[in-house]
Amino acid sequence: MANTQITSRKAFRRTDDYTPGTPKVKLVNEALPNPIPPNSVLIKVHAVSLNYRDANIANGGNPWPVTPNGILCNDAAGEVIAIGERVKSFVIGDRVAPIVDTANITGRETGRSWLAADEDGVLADYIVFDEEKISKLSPHLDWIEASILPCAGVTAWSALKDIGIGKSVLIQGLCLPVHEYVRILY
């Protein structure tokens, strides 16, 4: 376990004020868990990717309920800077991204819990995640490239996971990240 001097973070939380012309987010300073929970890691966020969904949630247009005043965004890439005492899969310096649906880790679970909707998102300078809810990133991607992986990759996989062997898939618009992942996975 590494001890870190980071005890607080800056994060962008929704105001949940949907009046036209009012701010939709506010920058807040808030405490981080100290010590880090035993199975968790502290991540320094290097890049966050914005999706249409993020603007939709901030503007009150999400069709499902969201956590009040939650932190926005579900795609990020960062570096592990501290680990809890029971963490086995990660070390300080690992490049990681959070799993977007934290209740559906293997793809076989039936529950759902989406970052930035059902729980806080990643638009912060530091985030804490259980080690089972993050993935290692390839070293050949820069931080910005890596930050688009979580949602686009999961969306592509979700679209393909129930397609049977010998079935065809039509992929339109090969210029967007989700389309590229579908092409690669299929």
Predicted segments with their positions:
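Eukaryotic N-terminal low-complexity, Ser/Thr- and Lys/Arg-rich leader segments
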Residues: 1-22, 29
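Glycine-rich beta-strand-centered segment in the early N-terminal region that forms part
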Residues: 31-49, 61-103, 138-141
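Cytochrome P450 core scaffold surrounding the K-helix E-X-X-R motif
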Residues: 53-59, 107
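Residue-level marker of beta-strand positions
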Residues: 94-95, 126, 168
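Short, Lys/Arg- and Gly-enriched loop/turn segments at beta-strand edges
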Residues: 103-111
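Structured surface patches comprising rigid loops and adjacent beta-strands/short helices at the edges
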Residues: 128-136
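Mid-domain Rossmann-like dinucleotide-binding core that forms the NAD(H)/NADP(H) cofactor-binding site
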Residues: 144-186
